[in-house]
Every structure is written in structure tokens, then in C-alpha cells.
Amino acid sequence: MRTVLVVIFLLFYALISLPMFLVGFILGKIDPHKKPRFSQPFVIWGFRMILRISGVKLTVKGKENILRGQSALYVFNHRSYFDILAGYVTAPVPTAFVSKKEIGKLPMISRWMKYMNCLFLDRDDMKQGMRTILQGIELLKDGTSIYIAPEGTRNSGEELLPFHEASFKLADKSKRPVIPVALNNTDEVFEKHLPWIHSAHIIIEYCEPIYMDQMERAEKKHIGETVRAILAEKVAENAKES
């Protein structure tokens, strides 16, 4: 039943998105900064509705570590499409996600993502990947936070996959803090029950900021391992509360 209700809501959301796209387009012509600030609250509302219909109980820990008025690189462990929903409904405005290029081909979703300055990464094209990193650095400098999963893909295993160190260039070059974000049980909603949606208790924890500009060069070299260890510890701790 939850699955049917989510599908019905998505159809409704797609319908009302049409005039909202036009509003966002016009605002973007007036001021490019207004487009993401208009779009993200509408997307957050949609995500909140999906979480509610899905029967998700969302526990947010470490709210004091969510930076308001300053951009940051939010680094999360990736287990499910619902990571994005849990992330966006708790993230500051404006925030953009780094996603694989295939998502950019989905009609309605890709339009909203582009309106929010989300980045599409082609993992098979190094030049395009570098351009994406440079775009992300400029977004961070301009005040837009970025959510990224350094594992590079969804992980269904017990242990976190190795982190791609290049992801952290976004924070290093923009001189913005890294905030590890630990997610638990997001795959309990959908991926573990395909094609059905089940209720679940999602825990998202924002960890203390890490300032790379205060680190030694040797520490920066292994920042991915450091953040991975922090997230692995938090995921293990929060698993006991699930």
C-alpha cells in the first residue's frame, strides 16, 4: 500500500512541478541565486512527503554541526536512494548533490537537480570529472554546500567501501570544512524489499566539522581514510539504536 501511495504522490508532484519549473526559470533570469533558493524548499517538501508516506521515522543527531550561513562539504556513506531524501530534508539551503551522470537523464528529477546546481559526475571521463570538481569548488566558494558520497556507488555490504580521495579536493581548494554524515537504515526502506517500500527508522548523524586548512600536508593526504573511519564508527554506534 505504501508503494502505491508513493507512486500516486510522485505523479501528483510531477504535475505540479510543471508550473513550478516556469517560476524557477523566471526567477533564475532575474537572479541566478534565486533559482536554487526557490527550488530546494519545494524539493524538500516533496521529499518530506515521500518519507512520511513511506512510514519513515527520521532521527537527526548532531544538528549543531549543520552549518548555517556557511557552505561546507557534507560527506556521507551511501547505501540507498533514500540517503538523498534524508540528506536534503536536513541540509541547509542552498545545498547541491554530486550524482552519477545517469541521473541527469531522468526528466523531472534532473531538471530540479539542475535548478539546485547539482553536479553530474562521469566516472569514466577524467577530464569531465575534473571539470565537475572545479564547478563544485566554485559553488562552495559562492555559498552553496555540497553533499558527496566518496564511496562512489551504493554499498550493500557491512563495511564502507574505500573513499576516493579526490572528492576532498572540493573542500581543500575552496577552504571549506568537511562534515562527515553517517546514515543508518536508509536501505531498509526500499533496496532490501524491492520493489516494495517498507517503513523504517533512519538515523542521520552530522559529525563535527573538519578544517583541512588546519591540517598538515601528510594528514590531508589521508583525509579520505580519516573521514571513512569516523563514519564507520558512527554507523556502528547508531546501528545499536536501530
What are these regions (language model features)?
Residues 53-61, 129-130, 186-188:
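Short gly/ser/thr-rich secondary-structure transition/capping motifs
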Residues 61, 98-100, 122-123, 150, ...:
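Thr-Gly-centered strand-to-loop micro-motif
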Residues 48, 85, 168-169:
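Active-site phosphate/pyrophosphate- and oxyanion-stabilizing loops and adjacent acidic/basic residues
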Residues 60, 74, 97, 204-206:
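Generic preference for hydrophobic
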Residues 21-44, 52-54, 68-126:
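Catalytic core of membrane glycerolipid acyltransferases/transacylases, capturing the structured
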Residues 1-29, 41, 64-67, 221-242:
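Membrane-interfacial terminal anchoring regions of lipid-handling membrane enzymes
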Residues 130-242:
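Non-catalytic C-terminal accessory region of glycerolipid acyltransferases
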